[in-house]
């Protein structure tokens, strides 16, 4: 399969595309729910309908969030984003490389901070029961795939590899630093330990 870098649809049809951007992911502000739409004049009818819908759905964002957003949108984030992507790729690749096996179907993360492993050697009545067993036996908390519309009988779980101090990690690397196991053991020990425990659970009978 040939993978090509993602391209934004406005590059092909700017007059028929609206752009939505939010701070929750790239700015690590998950609870803020702040973002914006850029809508071309050709879609003014859509814009007007969305304004009506928005006015009936939520009120204005709190002042502290607005001030923080102004600071965020007026700063240069190149170094931050480069380091964040490097760290998440390093952590995600580590988890992937340690979990992939004949007993686990898993795809490498192409962005973000989630993996969706399928444990094909496990036989539970549903993925929720499987995740309960993982938590009980390893202390690793995963969400069942059924919570995301996947078949309950599929032993799939969503794994988030973000249980580490990102600020501390960033402060101790440069943009060209290679993320290896030594760094992960120092700045993401819970990831290393949790992955080891989960791998042990997979290999257990």
Predicted feature descriptions by range:
Residues 1-16:
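Single conserved hydrophobic/aromatic residue that forms the stacking wall/gate
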Residues 17, 35, 69, 88, ...:
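Generic structural signal for small/hydrophobic residues in well-ordered secondary structure
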Residues 18-86, 96-97, 177, 181, ...:
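Conserved core segment of the aminotransferase class I/II
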Residues 40, 74, 118-121, 162-164:
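Residue-level recognition of strand-loop junctions within catalytic nucleotide-signaling folds
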Residues 70, 87-96, 106-119, 155:
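Conserved glycine-rich beta-strand-loop-beta hairpin in the small C-terminal domain of fold type I
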Residues 123-129, 167-170:
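Short, conserved charged micro-motifs
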Residues 133-142, 148-205:
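PLP-dependent enzyme catalytic core of the Aspartate aminotransferase-like
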